Every structure is written in structure tokens, then in C-alpha cells.
């Protein structure tokens, strides 16, 4: 029987794509393995096109068909859809769906074990509750952590903080000292772990504990990018036990989308090399009209060329139809900046834009996939974190890696036009900006080396597969 590995994706298209890319990477170096990807779909009453967990059947079926045709050694297995009567927020739905389908997971894994040598299962870290099933079945259990090693170190440290304190993190008002990392203020910890009374707090303690107690964690980073913290892990300097780590990144989409329906790539073709700053904040990065206007004024003040993806919050009084750009932005802004800037609604081919020679800077929400895309293309960043672990990523990018600048927010979370304009100008047109550009160019070279034959990430992948075959 063939040796097989199961990858279990969390709910949502982005999570599925991450697992597919991991599967493709494994097979490109170890084609004798068979890979099965398990995926979840939302309950019928909670699959809306605008939901962050949206998983429309047609789009998913087309994506899976394309992957299967290109990579026959990857097979897909959908966890049967179940009903959850209570409408839950996206993150809570993700956790609950995995927990509530444990009996289906047990049946599927038992079936796979009867037709192949099931060597290991890799869980998306959001599917942490599946470890209870896999441990009962005595299947070696690994986690795929799609962020970096630095935030993983902070996640493990959260267990120690929980054990040693009765206060919530938000009340500590202190800097955390974690081996291999710069000082991290408690204000920069993820919102979900700030407050012990937050319903997500215990979940993240459980996630950290399950990952720490697993057979290993696969991390989407590379040694040269997070060298100090990886050295701390490898030398056993972390407080408390840690599992084996395998840094196999950067794993990002292997084929940048070249769709140019809005003409942005053609527009970039007409701009000077490294002259355009790109602003995009992820699928959940929506701003109030007040903030959008501050961004617009700041870009105009900066006098830099720009390509900006605008996503607006739904505000009371808005009609079903989204407001036009003219309604959202300052009067005359589009006309005044049409020679220097381009504004898009809701979406842009980010990977293709970042790889374009005209792009010289990236204002980002610091989502890890976006960070990796920027690093792989050597594009320096302005860090504007919005949610999840993004404040931690900002600290690492700015204080540790020194490949970006951070914007300052006021007490209401607003970034002023002056602040944004100054940071954009500093990144694009200053000596400090040049230093940052040189640093991230070196990091780009290191990323290429890590994924080349004999590189650190490929060697880590080979070690991982050796361990799997020994199970």
C-alpha cells in the first residue's frame, strides 16, 4: 500500500488554498506520497457570498477540479455538511464546525487507513479540536501554522502567561521578553487573548496547548527570515516544552493571477520602475468613510504614485448598492490624482501587482501571506495592522526584520492623513527607505535560496518526510 498523508483544511477558501499549496510542495519533492485533503463547508444557512468563510459550491468545485487535473496525486474529500442552527461569527463557526464533525473525521480516517499506509495527519491550526480524534486513533498529528515562527513563539508563551497570572493581558501594561524576539508590549497581543473574559481566550489557550503537545509544527517561514527566534527554539531557550518545528516556507500561490479586468497591470506598465506604492488590506480590511478620506488626503500630500484597493464598511443609511468612489473619497480627488494614482474597488491581483517592476512600496495590514508575497518580491512595507496577529507581525517586521515602517494610530484607531503621507514619503523617498529596500532585497534572495535545492526549507521538508516514513 502507498504511504499517504492527510491534510485537514479549516473552513474557508483561503485555508483550502494554503493546504493545497503545502500539498503541492510536498509532492514536488516527494512524488511517491499520496495526499488527501479534507475540507469543510459551511452549514446551509451560513454560506453567504460576503461571508469571510464563503465557500460557494461552483467556485470550489472548479478550483478542486483544476488542482486535481494538474496534480493527480492530490485527492479531495469533503467532510459531510451539517446544520448548526445558531448563526455564529466566522471564527466561532470555524471552531464549532470542526468540533461538531469529529465523528465524520473518525470514519473518514479509519477508511483511509484501510486502503493506504496513513503516516500522519496535518491539521490547520484552526482545526485544533480534531487532535482529540487523531490522538484516539493513534495517528501522528502535526499542525500547519500559516503565520511565522515569531507569532508561534508568542502563542506558546501565552500558555505560560496564563499559568502565572490571574490578570488579563490587557491589564498587565508591560513588555513581554521572549527569547529571540524584540520586546513585545501587551497592547500588541491579539485581541482574542487580551481578555480572560473573552469567549475566544480559552480557545487560543487550547490551540497553543494542542500544538505544543503535537508531533510537530510545520511553519510557513524560512530560517533566514526569522533566524533569532528559530535559534531560540532550536537551542531550547523557550520557557516550557516545544514540539519539533519544520520551517518549509515561503509557501505562497505558485501562479500569480494575471487577470487585468480593471487595467491596473497595464497602468503599472506605464509607470517608472519602483515608483508606485500599493495599498491593500486583505479581504476583511474595510474602512469607514472618515478613514478612507484620511488615506486619500495622505496619498495626495505624499506626492507619490499609488495604486489603492478601496474597501468600505457598511454604514447606517447606506443602500444595498455600495457607495461609489466619488461618494467615499474627497471631492475632486480622483480627478486631481488621475495622472499619478489609480483606485480600484474591493479586489486587485495582488501577487501580480507586487511582482511588477513599477511597484516600490506596499501599505499592508500585515497578514502573513501578504508579508510573504512582499518579501518574495523584495517590496518594502508600511505596516498598518488591523486584526488577529497582525500587530505582532508589525513588531517583527519593523523592529526585528527592519523591512518596514509602522503607521501610528490615535486612541480611536484612526490613522491621520499627515501620518500616512509622511510614512509613504519616508518609505519611497528617503535614506531610511533606501536602507529598508536593501534589507528586503537581501531577504528576497534568502527566500529564493531557502526554496532551492539544498536550501534550508527544502532540507526541513525532507527531514519532515523522513520522520513521517518512520512512523
Swiss-Prot record:
CDD domains: GT1_Gtf-like (cd03784). SUPFAM superfamilies: UDP-Glycosyltransferase/glycogen phosphorylase. PROSITE patterns: UDPGT. GO terms for molecular function: isoflavone 7-O-glucosyltransferase activity. UDP-alpha-D-glucose binds at residues 146, 348, 350, 365, 368-370, 373, 389-390. It comes from the Eukaryota. The active site is at 15 (proton acceptor), 124 (charge relay). Induction: Up-regulated by methyl jasmonate. Keywords: Glycosyltransferase, Transferase. Expressed in roots. Detected in stems and leaves. An anthocyanidin binds at residues 15, 388. Its EC number is 2.4.1.170. Signal peptide: none annotated. It catalyses: a 7-hydroxyisoflavone + UDP-alpha-D-glucose = a 7-hydroxyisoflavone 7-O-beta-D-glucoside + UDP + H(+). Belongs to the UDP-glycosyltransferase family. Isoflavone 7-O-glucosyltransferase converting daidzein to daidzin, genistein to genistin and formononetin to ononin. Shows some activity toward the chalcone isoliquiritigenin, the flavanones liquiritigenin and naringenin, and the flavone apigenin, but not toward cyanidin, luteolin, kaempferol, quercetin, daidzin and puerarin. This is UDP-glycosyltransferase 1. It comes from Pueraria montana var. lobata (Kudzu vine).
Amino acid at each position: 500500500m502507498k504511504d499517504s498523508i492527510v491534510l485537514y483544511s479549516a473552513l474557508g477558501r483561503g485555508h483550502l488554498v494554503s493546504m493545497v499549496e503545502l500539498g503541492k510542495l510536498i509532492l514536488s519533492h516527494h512524488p511517491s506520497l499520496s495526499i488527501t485533503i479534507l475540507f469543510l463547508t459551511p452549514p446551509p444557512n451560513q454560506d453567504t457570498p460576503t461571508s469571510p468563510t464563503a465557500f460557494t459550491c461552483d467556485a470550489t468545485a472548479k478550483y478542486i477540479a483544476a488542482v486535481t487535473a494538474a496534480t493527480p496525486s492530490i485527492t479531495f474529500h469533503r467532510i459531510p455538511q451539517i446544520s448548526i442552527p445558531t448563526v455564529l461569527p466566522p471564527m466561532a463557526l470555524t471552531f464549532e464546525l470542526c468540533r461538531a464533525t469529529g465523528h465524520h473525521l473518525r470514519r473518514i480516517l479509519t477508511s483511509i487507513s484501510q486502503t493506504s499506509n496513513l503516516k500522519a495527519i496535518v491539521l490547520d491550526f484552526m482545526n485544533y479540536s480534531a487532535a482529540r480524534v487523531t490522538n484516539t486513533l493513534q495517528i501522528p498529528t502535526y499542525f500547519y501554522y500559516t503565520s511565522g515562527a515569531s507569532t508561534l513563539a508568542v502563542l506558546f508563551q501565552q500558555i505560560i502567561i496564563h499559568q502565572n497570572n490571574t490578570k488579563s493581558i490587557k491589564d498587565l501594561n508591560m513588555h513581554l521578553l521572549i527569547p529571540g524576539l524584540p520586546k513585545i508590549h501587551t497592547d500588541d497581543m491579539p485581541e482574542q487573548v487580551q481578555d480572560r473574559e473573552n469567549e475566544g481566550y480559552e480557545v487560543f489557550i487550547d490551540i497553543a496547548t494542542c500544538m505544543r503537545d503535537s508531533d510537530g509544527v510545520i511553519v510557513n517561514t524560512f530560517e533566514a527570515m526569522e533566524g533569532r527566534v528559530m535559534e531560540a527554539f532550536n537551542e531550547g531557550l523557550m520557557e516550557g516544552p516545544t514540539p519539533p518545528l519544520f520551517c518549509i516556507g515561503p509557501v505562497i500561490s505558485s501562479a500569480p493571477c494575471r487577470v487585468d479586468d480593471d487595467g491596473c497591470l497595464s497602468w503599472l506598465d506605464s509607470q517608472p520602475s519602483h515608483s508606485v506604492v500599493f495599498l491593500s488590506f486583505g479581504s476583511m480590511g474595510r474602512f469607514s468613510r472618515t478613514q478612507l478620506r484620511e488615506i486619500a488626503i495622505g496619498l495626495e500630500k505624499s506626492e507619490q504614485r499609488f495604486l489603492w484597493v478601496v474597501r468600505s464598511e457598511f454604514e447606517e443609511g447606506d443602500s444595498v448598492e455600495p457607495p461609489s468612489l466619488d461618494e467615499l473619497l474627497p471631492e475632486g480627488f480622483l480627478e486631481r490624482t488621475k495622472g499619478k494614482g489609480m483606485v480600484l474597488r474591493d479586489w486587485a491581483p495582488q501577487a501580480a501587482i507586487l511582482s511588477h517592476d513599477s511597484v516600490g512600496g506596499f501599505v499592508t495590514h500585515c497578514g502573513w501571506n501578504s508579508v510573504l508575497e512582499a518579501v518574495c518580491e523584495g517590496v518594502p512595507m508600511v505596516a498598518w495592522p488591523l486584526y488577529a496577529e497582525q500587530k505582532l507581525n508589525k513588531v517583527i517586521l519593523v523592529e526585528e526584520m527592519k523591512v518596514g515602517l509602522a503607521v501610528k494610530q490615535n486612541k480611536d484607531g484612526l490613522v491621520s492623513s499627515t501620518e500616512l503621507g509622511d510614512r509613504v514619503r519616508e518609505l519611497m523617498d528617503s535614506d531610511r527607505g533606501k536602507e529598508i529596500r536593501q534589507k528586503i532585497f537581501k531577504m528576497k534572495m534568502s527566500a529564493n535560496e531557502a526554496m532551492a535545492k539544498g536550501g534550508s526549507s527544502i532540507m526541513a521538508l525532507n527531514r519532515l518526510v523522513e520522520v513521517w516514513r518512520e512512523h
